[in-house]
Amino acid sequence: VEYIPLTDNEEMYNRIQLGDTFDLLCPSEYMIMKLAAEDLIQPYPESFYDVNVETNYYAQNVSPYIAETFSAPIAESSDHTWADYAAGYMWGTTGFVFNPENANAEDMKTWDAFTNPTYNKKITAKNNVRDSYFSGLGIHYEDELLELKSQLDAGTLSSADYQARLSQMMNDTPPETMDDVEKILKNVKGNIQAFETDEAKNDFIAGRIDVSYQWSGDAVYIMDEVEAESGIACSYVVPEAASNLW
């Protein structure tokens, strides 16, 4: 097996565009959508999901939640499902990992943590289209998202309607929304230490930053390393309004 590490999804995409070929890819879901839409990846054979094949461990053991999620269409206009092109490698949430000695847990419950001057140059954001734009939408729609959540909790909004409206907001791409998100992200850029892909883990562990927007798996790694090195029990919080499931 030849294992080829890549910096991010965009590097993977560019290499494929330049003619590189791979037998198996491990991209994020938004890149799977892009690759499928451009016919740059092939569907799995039906035999991959045959539970009667002894070595099909994924098909036999995948969680019902993931199986149901992957049964949805990969795009509105597509006849293909996520499962046609992808099998789950790992999944989790995105949120803020923070040092409680230097950051307030209440501040981490809101997307405005990115622009909070208390954490000027002590907080990082993700440097990819999905998570960066999602963060901007979180700030843009935070009040509306919290109101939706309040209606759901009060029983005046059904779970299905809540999910539909949540999905609409957090996938919103008309020009006026994108313009607002662009302005928001420019404000974010002025307050954060950096938009980063992987570097924040070491920066956090070394004490150069106090807050980092992270995938939950990397957040656990950071918390374990900081506690092992300094004895500080860091925390991970998902913004109350909404967050990204990956």
Q: Which residues fall in each region the model found?
A:
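Glycine-rich beta-alpha junction loops
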Residues: 1, 129-132, 217-218
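Early extracytoplasmic/lumenal segment of secretory-pathway proteins
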Residues: 1-38
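Generic structural signal for residues in well-ordered beta-strands
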Residues: 1-3, 123, 234-236
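Short beta-strand and adjacent tight-turn residues that come in two discontinuous sequence segments
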Residues: 6, 26-27, 125, 195, ...
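Alpha-to-beta junction loops
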Residues: 18-26, 40-42, 119-122, 206-214
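A residue-level structural signature of the nucleotidyltransferase/glycosyltransferase Rossmann-like core
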Residues: 23-24, 88, 95, 210-211, ...
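Extracytoplasmic ligand-binding site segments that recognize negatively charged/polar headgroups
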Residues: 30-191, 195-203, 222
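Extracytoplasmic/periplasmic substrate-binding proteins
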Residues: 190-246
